[in-house]
Amino acid sequence: MRATSEELLELVNRSPAAVAIHDRKAWLELFSRTAVVQDPVGTAPHRRTVSGDGAASGDDPLGRFWETFIAPNRISFTSYQDIVIGDEVVRDVLIRSELGSGISIEVPAYLIYRTTEENGEARIEALMAHWELRGMVRQVIAAGLAGLSTMIQLGWRMLKIQGAAGLLGFAQGISRGIFGGGRRAVRNFAAALNARDEKALVGLLDGEETLIEYPAGVGESVQEFLDGAGRDLRIDVSGLTSAGWSSSCVFRANRGDVTHRGVAFFEFNPKTGKVRSARFFWNV
């Protein structure tokens, strides 16, 4: 039997709960045998390739992720909005971390959990955390010598636990991505839609294959969107974040007497920098 929205939300809530009390075993057991964690998006993903019995072993890529980024820190989450559509759960959160060195940082993030059923139970198949790695690094470095020491310690920890490939995979989240260009594109998307400037809107998109999901799970071509759900729609965006080749935001959409508030994700073509897809999540 397919899990209900309440059951899926309860499943993903167990993730920050396990992190808060440093229950490694409980956290690892939330994920499927083939789960992937990309935290943040833009860094190299951590993919499981082991069977069920070995899922929580030291060879588990998710276990190495835990030991690198969770074990030495105290992490808490404040959720501002939870959205469930189909098998996906989206959360608008603030992540607070007290690092092992004593430095405290706050990172706004949008989380996408994709779930699946495994042996009759709901499991997390993918966790994609959209937050800005550059912003986090700036917070740490702003602490002066303590911050510099913290970054050096993190680098050595990654090298020890994940090897050179893991360190380089994490660093690519700082050097590769859409960054400010993505945030500008999202603002321009909303402005063009609100102005009914179809030419400007189409100019932001990566050709005819660009899909608009409004709501998420219902993919349409740009023209179908403009002629249907996007007609007479006004969208305001805030809280823009870029991670890798994607940008995300909180949105408020109005069409007549109907208002939706949720989280949107824009994916960009790395070659062109144009919008490849736009997905709008709200509780329908």
What do these predicted regions represent?
Residues 1-284:
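C-terminal and inter-domain tail/linker signature
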